[in-house]
């Protein structure tokens, strides 16, 4: 494939994809994995109701809708680790605010997680490409 006068090979694209996966998993300026539960440093304040509310074992009574805001605005880490979720990640300046109220950066979504699944499937099927 070409991009202007530059030829882009499959090897170039695979290398770029590997760098992007490595970035998501912690090889970035923040030295933080944007996959929750992966590595030594990962986001603690995920914008996800099930992850940020106490479990039914810790809080057996129902939590009414409006009572959930105290958990949204809490500075405490999420009581339930949403292992494997990929968050929105850093902004255009490579800055990341680990703040569950900043949904642009701290919310996991299918359109964020799905592309990584494809890349990881490729690298799992092609270990030599790693």
Curated annotation (Swiss-Prot):
Query: What InterPro entries does its record include?
Result: 6-hairpin_glycosidase_sf (IPR008928), 6hp_glycosidase-like_sf (IPR012341), Glyco_hydro_9 (IPR001701), Glyco_hydro_9_Asp/Glu_AS (IPR033126), Glyco_hydro_9_His_AS (IPR018221)
Query: Which enzyme class, named as a word?
Result: hydrolase
Q: What's in the keyword line of the UniProt record?
A: Carbohydrate metabolism, Cellulose degradation, Fruit ripening, Glycosidase, Hydrolase, Polysaccharide degradation
SUPFAM superfamilies for the chain: Six-hairpin glycosidases
Q: Which Gene3D superfamilies match?
A: 1.50.10.10
Query: E.C. number, please?
Result: 3.2.1.4
**Sequence similarity:** Belongs to the glycosyl hydrolase 9 (cellulase E) family.
Query: What role is this protein assigned?
Result: Involved in ripening fruit process.
Q: What is this protein called?
A: Endoglucanase 2
Q: Give the organism the record lists.
A: Persea americana
Taxonomy of origin reads:
Eukaryota, Viridiplantae, Streptophyta, Embryophyta, Tracheophyta
